[in-house]
């Protein structure tokens, strides 16, 4: 199979084939996931919680993100690599640009930024530099303290209207992809139809252009013993991790995942 590129993802959106995305933090899992057909590997700052044991993503440094990106790059066999910019990267546009360059040098094909319309300037600057950006809207974990916890976003009409406007504005600024987290399924469908760029969902229903889960969640691994509503344990009924990942890819592609039970109402 040829390497997955941004052009590949754009083609999948146009054809209606769903995009399978999964978090990944090391070479072995990168090799396993890419061989199983995962289109996009997300080196997420979720590593702060599932690998480091923190209660949020805030303590993760950009240097740690670069380290794990390099690990994933060495094991990857053709998937597109997207890496989160750490929380510390957001205090100035100059810092965001410098840290994005560091992640691209480490092996990322795209960087991900959490936030709203205020990201238009750094996204535009990065696009001018040739750095593809995935904008992350809805429940943005780096803003967990502002939200008062990990809560569904966009249920109130004012919130929903702002999310729609943010999505369009960030596409116009140059965002190449969009991730929607924990928003009502109907709103996610509206946003997916309103923009031309690929839209990936997590807890956002089945109408987005693709799905992403945290690797540990979909393998049934948890420090707390509890999983978010939008998670399905794909290890159930499978004899190996590669088989579970392949089952996840199939379920995303044939739209059997997510089911209605994994989404949120307005």
UniProtKB/Swiss-Prot annotation:
Active-site residues annotated for this sequence: 181 (proton acceptor)
Superkingdom classification of source: Bacteria
Chemical reaction(s) catalysed: 3-methyl-2-oxobutanoate + (6R)-5,10-methylene-5,6,7,8-tetrahydrofolate + H2O = 2-dehydropantoate + (6S)-5,6,7,8-tetrahydrofolate
GO biological process per UniProt: pantothenate biosynthetic process
Keywords assigned by UniProt, alphabetized: Cytoplasm, Magnesium, Metal-binding, Pantothenate biosynthesis, Transferase
Enzyme Commission number(s) from the entry: 2.1.2.11
Name listed for the protein in its UniProt record: 3-methyl-2-oxobutanoate hydroxymethyltransferase 2
Organism: Pseudomonas aeruginosa (strain ATCC 15692 / DSM 22644 / CIP 104116 / JCM 14847 / LMG 12228 / 1C / PRS 101 / PAO1)
